[in-house]
Amino acid sequence: MMHSKKLMLGICLVLLIILIVGYVIMTKINSRSAQIKDTFNQTLKLYPTKNLEDFYDKEGFRDQEFEKGDKGNWIVDSEMVIELKDKKMESRSMVLYINRNTRTTKGNFIVRELWEDSKGYAQSKDTKYPVKMEHNRIIPTKPIADDKLRKEIENFKFFVQYGDFKDINDYKDGDISYNPNVPSYSAKYQLKNDDYNVKQLRKRYNIPTNKAPKLLLKGDGDLKGSSIGSKNLEFTFVENKEENIYFSDSINFKPTE
């Protein structure tokens, strides 16, 4: 009888330890997930910034990488990538370097093609069109003979100018991950086609699929902030061996080089 009581007490003690350890682990995971969400929210608060010149007066995260007196640079990048079956992969993107010290902005509109040659080797071709930004307008700095392309560049809008994540906290069933070795972190959500940002992308781009995208938020570097690290987001509509359709966007604050 005494042996039976000791055995039962031992089992209860083991179960209690398991419950305590499980609680500690779950608390740590939930805390990490909340920290990751908060880190992304700090960047997502920038959406929308309709006037790009507002970035001249926006302060980003600063650390020891910044020299004294350096106001830093915002780097804004939006890219649409489409690869259909048996077709070349084509991306059309624009990147701007917004210098807060000189209050000037320059960058490039980039058309990129990727394909495999007859021997199966990857080939690529990049065509860059230099631009500047004045009074919230994109202006090519070199003549462009193709009127359609010139208008595409002049009318280009970055995702940060129209994207809006005010409902991000309502997104359900997010897959949050963290790799302390890099370190890197991410959050993935399945969106619906009636999502505001998805509708905005379909309004501006000819997206050849009716599939609703997944939203992937990615970051690397210290969760508390780092000018060395980066954050970006990606709307993935299709991803397989034969086809890829996705839109990516990033806003990062860096020291002046």
Swiss-Prot record:
DNA repair keyword on record: no
Gene3D superfamilies from the UniProt entry: 2.50.20.40
GO CC terms: plasma membrane
Matches recorded under Pfam families: DUF576
Localization, UniProt: Cell membrane
Origin: domain of life: Bacteria
InterPro entries, per the entry: Csa, Csa_sf
Similarity field: Belongs to the staphylococcal tandem lipoprotein family.
Name by which UniProt lists this protein: Uncharacterized protein SA2274
